[in-house]
Amino acid sequence: MAAKLSIYAYYIKNSLNLTQIEQNSPVLSIFSLARKERNLLVFTAGENQYLCVYAFGVVTVCGIEDKTRIGELLKLLSYGEDLEEGQDPKIQPEDYAIAVDKEASESVEFDHVKLKTLTLEKFLLLSHVMAQSVAIDFVERRITDTQQALENIHSSLASHGKLVGTNTRSILKTVGMSGKMVYFMVTRLSLLDKPDITWEDKDAEVLFLNLRKMFELDDRFEALRFKLEFIKDSSETLMDIIGARRAQVLEIIIIVLIAIEIIFALIGIM
């Protein structure tokens, strides 16, 4: 009979400080550190019980079914950058099942993955993909918020022919958000990178690619990139409008100063 485990992925913060967690977190009284990488800490509490902490704000848990205990563990990982004001922290966690059966052939299914054995390396491949998936959910929500803000600005332009009901600062914040999301996906989330083991083990690479396909990471990334291109183009247009408005204001100020200078000159002559 196949042994079944569940793995859960939670987005809890904008980022997690791995150094502080490694040195200070009370979670160390329950779990022992099994592996340390640049953007990842892997803890274990026994056979097939893992806790992975990613620098980009995601925690994955395997082999623990008690949701109350999971919630308590997440509270112990409080070192990092909190969500910004106005952000919704309730990103839905993702879950996926692992069926371990020495007699079965390994495969990636819709709601579970079949493995002959569950090694740490195989678990980390699944954990990596799920962590990226739940982080993409967060990015998708942020991009949707940014698109909504841009839609409101464009509606103002369409209705009034000028920017009404908004200010330069809010527009610049919207522009900056698109760049921040690109940076997050490519650098911190490392969406385009493959784990080192996939370069050394063909079976690991096949498993990783099948998992990415199942969670539609590549398709979702392309969809996000298309939306970000739209946001980028809209942002450039808005920056041009802001630049033109500032230039117009500057011209008016110069004209007023010249007029004042002429008035003082006339007063002096009189």
Task: Show the residue positions of the predicted features.
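Generic alpha-helical structural element
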Residues: 62, 128, 132-135, 174, ...
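Charged, alpha-helix-enriched surfaces in structured cytosolic catalytic cores
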Residues: 68, 130, 134, 180
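Juxtamembrane/interface alpha-helical elements of multi-pass membrane proteins
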Residues: 104-169
